[in-house]
A protein has these predicted regions:
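Metabolite-binding pocket within alpha/beta catalytic cores that recognizes anionic/polar moieties
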Residues: 1-155
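Generic non-transmembrane alpha-helical segments
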Residues: 13, 17, 162, 166-176
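Glycine-rich beta-alpha junction loops
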Residues: 30-32, 115, 132-133, 182-188, ...
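Residue-level detector of anion-binding/catalytic polar loops
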Residues: 74, 106, 177, 206, ...
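Polyanion-binding loop/helix "lid" in catalytic or ligand-binding cores
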Residues: 148-160, 185-187, 197
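Active-site/ligand-binding-proximal alpha/beta "capping" segment
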Residues: 174-206
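A C-terminal functional module that forms or caps the active site or interfaces directly
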Residues: 194-201, 205-235
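Single conserved hydrophobic/aromatic residue that forms the stacking wall/gate
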Residues: 240-248
Length: 248
């Protein structure tokens, strides 16, 4: 069965169970699963019960697909994502985004936990992702083009400027401190060495993690608008900015 046929089969299964399919989806990254408790009137599915879906193997990723209301908005939420380092192919990592396209999702919010490479950041900061660097060894669009989008997608605005501006406006109104920056995605599963943190900083990255980029690429290929945010959970920049001990 082709990837297209699998995505359609999975979407048809979900449509048979859910009356109101939302237009907005959220991917909850590492440690952010508890946010799902804010969703009301929910209907949830374990990933293992969804045809063709991979299964989360990482602690902190519950592996549930949730439909319900967040505020007054219908929402679809992935409580846990799939990572390249788990042994999945990029086609499998990004399969849920293909399903979103089949469901008619128009906007995707992605979140992750990330290490800060920017010395101006603090642990706990929220960084709005304004761009990314793809450092993965495999590309999710490698191979025959699937007719969800063009062979060569435009990535000049991978993260919606309209959504970024709206988020900045809301953050200002609510007095929420936010950073903006570039996220670099790596394959993992090892955390970065001090030299790697320094290299990523030189390349222009403000935060580094092991997810998000593949999903965003496929979302853009599918014509889905994206907003991304990183929670800065550690500061790798301290490893390469600290004074080095010297003899004499």
């Amino acid at each position: 069965m082709s990837l297209y046929d699998k995505a359609k089969q999975t979407a048809d299964f979900i449509k048979s169970k859910i009356n109101n399919i939302p237009k907005t989806a959220i991917v909850l990254g590492s440690g952010l699963g508890p946010f799902a408790k804010e969703i009301e009137e929910e209907v949830e599915f374990d990933y293992k019960d969804i045809p063709n879906f991979p299964v989360s193997t990482v602690e902190g990723h519950s592996g549930k697909l949730i439909f319900g209301k967040l505020g007054n908005k219908d929402i679809m939420a992935m409580q846990g994502r799939f990572h390249f380092y788990e042994g999945y192919s990029m086609k499998e990592v990004t399969f849920p985004v293909r399903v979103m396209r089949e469901l008619g999702i128009k906007t995707l919010f992605v979140s992750n936990a990330a290490g800060g490479t920017n010395a101006d950041f603090e642990i706990g900061d929220l960084m709005i992702i304004r761009d990314h660097i793809n450092f993965f060894p495999e590309h999710p669009l490698h191979g025959k083009n699937i007719e969800y989008g063009p062979r060569f997608p435009d990535m000049s605005e991978a993260y919606s400027k309209e959504l970024i501006d709206k988020a900045l406006e809301i953050a200002k109104e609510k007095g929420i401190k936010v950073q903006q920056g570039v996220y670099i995605g790596t394959q993992g599963p090892t955390f970065e060495t001090p030299a790697e943190y320094k290299m990523f900083h030189i390349l222009g990255a403000d935060a580094v993690g092991m997810s998000t980029v593949p999903e965003v690429i496929v979302a853009n290929h599918c014509g889905i608008k994206v907003f991304g945010v990183s929670v800065i959970t550690d500061l790798g920049c301290l490893l390469y900015t600290s004074p080095s001990p010297r003899d004499g």
